[in-house]
UniProtKB/Swiss-Prot annotation:
Pfam family, one: DUF1283
Keywords recorded for this protein, A-Z: Signal
Signal keyword on record: yes
Source species of the chain: Escherichia fergusonii (strain ATCC 35469 / DSM 13698 / CCUG 18766 / IAM 14443 / JCM 21226 / LMG 7866 / NBRC 102419 / NCTC 12128 / CDC 0568-73)
Family: Belongs to the UPF0482 family.
Protein name in the entry: UPF0482 protein YnfB
Domain of life: Bacteria
Gene: ynfB
InterPro entries found in the cross-reference section: DUF1283
Amino acid sequence: MNILSGKLPFLLGAVFAGSVVLATSVQAETSKLIIESGDSAQSRQHASMEKEQWNDTRMLRQKVNKRTEKEWDKADAAFDNRDKCEQSSNINAYWEPNTLRCLDRRTGRVITP
């Protein structure tokens, strides 16, 4: 224990000095900053390729949007028809949720409320 206590201040000093040297060397390496204008041939080529891909997928995006809009319109019309059917003065009218139609209780045929 006596041998260790004599060397302890020396070891602590060496560790502290090593950390200071390490910290200053790290600061010196991170002082570089590279600024590009962003107008290189590679960036123009990349932008051109992205534009091509965007144009190629345009038709697919339009199809998806049309399908989504069509499904929404169908659901909206079914909601309106359900309200009309439930508020109908015809006591034999009922709403069939599976087929989204207003049916006659007696015949099972589609009716317009």
